[in-house]
Amino acid sequence: MKVKKISAANVEACSLPKLFDEEKIDFQPIQCVNWAEYPYKPKVSFRIAHTQNSILLHFKVKEESVRAKYGEDNGSVWTDSCVEFFSIPAGDGIYYNIECNCIGTILVGAGPVRNNREHAPKEVTALVQRWSSLGNQPFAERIGETDWEVALIIPVSYTHLRAHETSLHL
């Protein structure tokens, strides 16, 4: 997949859907479910682009129900309705994952394997701009088909979690 580089100064996360439309960046469907013990497969698609300094993501989700229990970063957002982005920006085997629930609360982790990952401090998570179509306040499970979207602007400096500079290679 080719990831488009765009020139967008001072773009806000809430403007990403419109910007991606203007730049004609298509949605890509997510077709796999990685956990046999969790076979539920909501309809999910995403768009991605980058600037010189940021990764831009826009997710669209359709689910049978939706929940946003966690409102503080680095909480258990994976138990909420959420999406996830993985990258290995420095090519050093350290991968970063950013999990984002349906209200824009994130968990940022880094490490070579799934377990014992280092979580980003609040100073790093605060750098990630977010927008959610469902707002940003936690809520209990809402039963019934729900469409939601989140947009993230992730500065390349989020890899400072590991205290090193990197360049974006997409």
What are these regions (language model features)?
Residues 1-69:
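Order/disorder boundary and secretion-linked terminal/linker segments
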Residues 45-46, 136-142:
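Beta-strand-rich interaction surfaces with strong enrichment in secreted/lumenal proteins
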Residues 53-55, 103, 146:
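Beta-strand-connecting loop/turn residues
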Residues 72-138:
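Extracellular/luminal beta-rich ligand-recognition
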Residues 148-158:
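Localized edge beta-strand/strand-to-loop motifs within extracellular or lumenal beta-rich domains
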Residues 159-166:
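Conserved small/polar residues in nucleotide/adenosyl-binding loops
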